[in-house]
A protein has these predicted regions:
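Short, low-complexity, disordered segments immediately C-terminal to signal peptides
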Residues: 21-50
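C-terminal active-site subregion of NodB/CE4 polysaccharide deacetylases
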Residues: 48-135, 151-167, 178-179, 285, ...
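Positively charged n-region of N-terminal signal peptides that target proteins for export
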Residues: 1-7, 21
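C-terminal motif of bacterial Sec signal peptides marking the signal peptidase cleavage site
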Residues: 16-19
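Hydrophobic helical h-region of N-terminal Sec-dependent signal peptides
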Residues: 9-14
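Alpha-helical scaffold elements lining the catalytic groove of polysaccharide deacetylases
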Residues: 249-285, 291-319, 337
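Active-site beta->alpha N-cap acidic-glycine motif
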Residues: 78-97, 101-278, 282, 333
Length: 423
């Protein structure tokens, strides 16, 4: 059994949590708490600051073998094996706010990791020889003997002794509930030109940091360990649209069609554009998570069409075209059957999607023989798997030992299913 549906379907909890509204507006640079910088440029700054001179960021193609089979004295070899894939939801910056005993605490425990756990996972996969690659480089479109379009797996050339890894990040939208539950809530560009985040600490102080969010932590880790990303890849954002993107309220509202709402929406659209540009410049890419985080296994074709058009209009128009869709709830379309190439799957293909990503117990992938598409699964480091049985721990053992990762001192007292290490 490749897929672990019971825990996936339970993720509907997060959708119910994420009711949208106006996000609180922090004054960037007002600082406090664990801010990693004394100042940063807010999107709402009264005057446009002088743009800093950014260090060049090199993105190279892992499908091209380096001249002479080596680069910077490091041999590169062909990789035709499995490309592993881990995905995360937003990481918890302040566990004391996330796990405060309210109705959301257990759901957050299930589906999230803390900043400390995320840092340990990155360190572990780095030490185990994984390197980051762009999900878009794993498969490409070709033609078969009859001239029909087909997807093919590409050969990657990686440093000898290294193993390719894809990271993806669901719901990087900064839903309004997150501010009260210990998450950061917006990406911004700092005075140094780099990506930072805004948030609030448990005392209510506004904090600008690079140490409290999955995006900025990974950026920082790659700066400190450039060999972790020899091609410049970071991760792929899996975005919905119903609460805007990246902390900016770019969405239309059925309940509010006023001129004031539209004016604010346009302001948010302009504010997020430089964020998107900097993310793209530094190796981040984008995929669809549907506009409304809809369950593709149960929705009608007409609902999927309307949702997809809204995603294209409100998200794709900002982040650019993508051929990747990440299934909400891990639920495949047309009855959640991996073998189906039904009308919803075909419609999504017609809109440019070629890589269809679900969630499972391995980095499974299959090139479909009846159409030009790839289906794949991702593994999910989170509370459900960190607390899991010895069997579940085995699914992740090539990346880390969950017993070394989970921080039971900050999580709810819900127990674990694995066998403790021998003392």
């Amino acid at each position: 059994m490749r897929r672990f549906l019971p825990i996936l379907l339970a993720f509907t909890l997060l959708t119910s949590l994420a009711a949208c509204g106006a996000a609180p507006s922090a004054s960037a640079g007002s600082g406090g708490g664990s801010s990693a910088s004394g100042s940063a440029a807010s999107s709402s700054a009264a005057s446009e600051p002088e743009k800093p001179q950014l260090e060049p960021y090199e993105i190279s193609d892992p499908k091209v073998e380096p001249a002479g089979g080596e680069k910077d004295g490091v041999p590169y070899v062909a990789w035709d094996g499995v490309v592993e894939h881990l995905f995360f939801h937003p990481v918890i910056a302040y566990p004391e706010l996330a796990f405060d005993g309210d109705a959301q605490s257990n759901g957050l425990d299930d589906w999230m990791v803390t900043v400390g756990e995320y840092n340990k996972i990155l360190q572990s996969v780095y030490e185990k020889g994984y390197i980051l690659v762009d999900m878009h480089d794993i498969w490409s479109e070709s033609t078969d003997a009859s001239g029909n379009p087909v997807m093919v797996k590409t050969t990657l050339y990686v440093p000898e002794g290294k193993k390719p890894l894809v990271l993806s990040f669901d719901d990087v939208n900064y839903y309004p509930y997150m501010l009260e539950d210990g998450f950061t809530y917006k990406l911004i560009i700092g005075d140094d030109g780099l990506i930072w985040t805004e948030g609030k600490d448990p005392q209510g102080n506004e904090v600008i940091s690079q140490d409290l969010d999955a995006t900025t932590i990974l950026d920082k880790f790659v700066r400190e360990h450039p060999d972790f990303s020899p091609f410049g890849a970071k991760g792929c954002f899996s975005l919905t649209g119903y609460c805007g993107i990246l902390g900016y309220r770019t969405q239309t509202e059925r309940e509010d069609t006023s001129a004031a709402h539209e004016a604010n929406r346009q302001k948010e659209i302009e504010a997020v554009k430089p964020i998107i540009a900097e993310l793209k410049r530094t190796g981040w890419t984008f995929g669809s998570h549907t506009w409304g985080h809809i369950n593709l296994a149960t929705k009608s074709l007409e609902t999927v069409k309307a949702d997809t058009q809204k995603w294209m209009d409100e998200v794709g128009s900002l982040v650019g075209p993508t051929n990747i869709i990440f299934y909400p709830h891990g639920a495949r379309p047309d009855g959640d059957d991996v073998k189906q190439t039904g009308p919803i799957f075909q419609y999504l293909q017609s809109q440019g999607f070629q890589v269809f990503a679900s969630v499972g117990i391995s980095s499974y992938s299959k090139i479909k023989s009846d159409t030009c598409a790839v289906i794949c699964d991702r593994l999910h480091p989170d509370g459900t798997t960190l607390r899991g049985s010895d069997k579940v721990l085995g699914w992740y053992s090539q990346f880390y030992d969950a017993r070394d990762i989970i921080d039971l001192s900050v999580r709810p007292d819900l127990g674990v299913k694995w066998t403790p290490k021998a003392s």
